[in-house]
């Protein structure tokens, strides 16, 4: 499960400008994106 969260974190950091990763499964996985970059998940 940690691998999924780590992968989600990497994807968020590399794609957050598109604001496509902080939704659904990745956003639910510990809300990693929100913790790292609030602007990434603010569109939720």
From Swiss-Prot:
The keyword Disulfide bond applies. GO terms for cellular component: extracellular region. Keywords: Disulfide bond, Secreted, Toxin. Expressed by the venom duct. It comes from the Eukaryota. Contains 3 disulfide bonds. GO terms for molecular function: toxin activity. It is found in: Secreted. The cysteine framework is XVIII (C-C-CC-CC). This is Conotoxin S5.1. It comes from Conus striatus. The lineage of its organism: Eukaryota, Metazoa, Spiralia, Lophotrochozoa, Mollusca.
């Amino acid at each position: 499960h940690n691998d999924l969260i780590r992968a989600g974190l990497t994807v968020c950091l590399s794609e957050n400008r598109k604001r496509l990763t902080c939704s659904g499964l990745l956003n639910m996985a510990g809300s990693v994106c929100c913790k790292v970059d609030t602007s990434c998940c603010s569109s939720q």
